[in-house]
Amino acid sequence: MRSPPKIKTYSTLSGNEIEICIVPPTQFVTKHQHQLLPNWDVLISYLILVLQRSSVSLKNPITKVNPEKNQLRARFMRFGCSLIFALHDLGAESDLFDPRSGYALLANSDQVLDDNAIVKATLGYQVVSYQQCSLLTHPVWEYKVYPSTIATSASLRVIDFCIDDLTSSLNWQPKL
């Protein structure tokens, strides 16, 4: 039996909590890699899940939720771009999936990735339907979670090095 994935939790300078988890690719990702990342000649070795704690429940009215989701997406895009280019610099294929559209940022993809489905498949978190959307249910944060996904061909050692370097440069503090 495989051990559960290790989740590292960080606190940003503004006090936001972020969880980062490195997991093997799901069956869906493995089966659809060519559609998700058509320009890759190597296999995905790991998915990097980035879960951000939202300041509001994503079950709130859309007028409260949309500005929060935009802010969380922007934070992920900044972090994710820095991480994928650091991994690229060390020779690994890497791409992130835009949480809003589900499409890979760098690939000319015709397949979307559902972040909630990836988290459900890898971490076992529940997903519920709510007003034509699917919401992830975090075991502690409940509906206050914004998931995002990065794919890479890098080794675990290289991923850990890049994440440690990037989180340190951002002054994100690991929570014990």
Q: Can you describe what each PLM-predicted range is?
A:
Residues 1-175:
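Auxiliary alpha/beta "docking" domains used to position bulky ligands
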